[in-house]
Swiss-Prot record:
HAMAP family: Ribosomal_uS3_B (MF_01309_B). This is Small ribosomal subunit protein uS3. Pfam families: KH_2 (PF07650), Ribosomal_S3_C (PF00189). One of its GO terms (biological process) is translation. Gene3D superfamilies: 3.30.300.20, Ribosomal protein S3, C-terminal domain. It comes from Histophilus somni (strain 129Pt). The gene is rpsC. Part of the 30S ribosomal subunit. Forms a tight complex with proteins S10 and S14. Belongs to the universal ribosomal protein uS3 family.
Length: 235
C-alpha cells in the first residue's frame, strides 16, 4: 500500500521525452545500453560539482551525441573549452565511436528537481537544519513560478535514534494527472549519523497537446565556451 509509480516513467511518451534516443538491432541493443550507462556514470562522477541536471544521449550514424544540461556551463566547458574536449575524448573511448558533446544551460536551477534535491542533500551534509533547508527550497521554487512543490526527507533526522520521514508541500502536485509536467528526482546526504534520503517533486503546469506541444517548444541554446569567473557561481 501507498507505493507511488515513478512520475517520469508513467509519463514517457505522453509529456516526458526519453533520455536516450536511438534505434539498434537486437545484437547491438545491449552494447548500446551498457555504453549509455557507462557514459552517464563517468560524466556524473567527473562533473559532480558542475550542477548537472540530466544527460541526454543520441546515436546518429555510428557516432554518439551527448547533451549535458547544467546550471554551471562554465565549469563544464573549462578554460577555452579544454575541459569539454577532454570529456569528448573520454566519452569516445568509452562508447567506441566518435563523440560530440553539447552543453545546454539550465536557466532556473531552483525549478529543477535534481538540482534542488542535490542542494538540500549538500546542506544536510553541512549540518544545516533539515526543516530550514526544505523550507528554503520550497520558497525559492514557488517564487520562480512553480505551481507546486513537495520535498520529503527520510532517515535519522537531526541525529535521532529512530529514523523517520518528514515532508513539506506548497501548491498543487497532481501525480495522477498525466498531462501534468511533474519533475521528480532524488538525492542522498551522507552524514555522520547515516544516510538521509531526499525526494523532490516539482509541478510546473499542465502540457496540453502531449509530445507534439513539447516538440514545438524552443530548445535551450547551447552555451558558448567562456572562462568561468573567479569567486562566483552557484554552490
Amino acid at each position: 500500500m501507498g507505493q507511488k509509480v515513478h512520475p517520469h516513467g508513467i509519463r514517457l511518451g505522453i509529456v516526458k521525452p526519453w533520455n536516450s534516443t536511438w534505434f539498434a538491432n537486437t545484437q547491438d541493443f545491449a552494447d548500446n545500453l551498457d555504453g549509455d550507462f557507462k557514459v552517464r556514470q563517468f560524466l556524473n562522477k567527473e562533473l559532480a560539482n558542475a550542477s548537472v541536471s540530466r544527460i541526454t544521449i543520441e546515436r546518429p550514424a555510428k557516432s554518439i551525441r551527448v547533451t549535458i544540461h547544467t546550471a554551471r556551463p562554465g565549469i563544464v566547458i573549462g578554460k577555452k573549452g579544454e575541459d569539454v574536449e577532454k570529456l569528448r575524448n573520454a566519452v569516445a573511448a568509452i562508447a567506441g565511436v566518435p563523440a560530440q558533446i553539447n552543453i545546454a544551460e539550465v536557466k532556473k536551477p531552483e525549478l529543477d528537481a535534481k538540482l534542488v534535491a542535490g542542494s538540500i542533500a549538500s546542506q544536510l551534509e553541512r549540518r544545516v537544519m533539515f526543516r530550514r533547508a526544505m523550507k528554503k527550497a520550497v520558497q525559492n521554487a514557488m517564487r520562480l513560478g512553480a505551481k507546486g512543490i513537495k520535498v520529503e526527507v527520510s532517515g535519522r533526522l537531526g541525529g535521532a535514534e529512530i529514523a523517520r520521514s518528514e515532508w513539506y508541500r506548497e501548491g498543487r502536485v497532481p501525480l495522477h494527472t498525466l498531462r501534468a509536467d511533474i519533475d521528480y528526482n532524488t538525492s542522498e546526504a551522507h552524514t555522520t549519523y547515516g544516510v538521509i534520503g531526499v525526494k523532490v517533486w516539482i509541478f510546473k503546469g499542465e502540457i496540453l497537446g502531449g509530445m507534439a506541444a513539447i516538440a514545438q517548444q524552443p530548445e535551450q541554446q547551447p552555451a558558448t565556451p567562456k572562462k568561468a569567473p573567479r569567486g562566483k557561481g552557484r554552490k
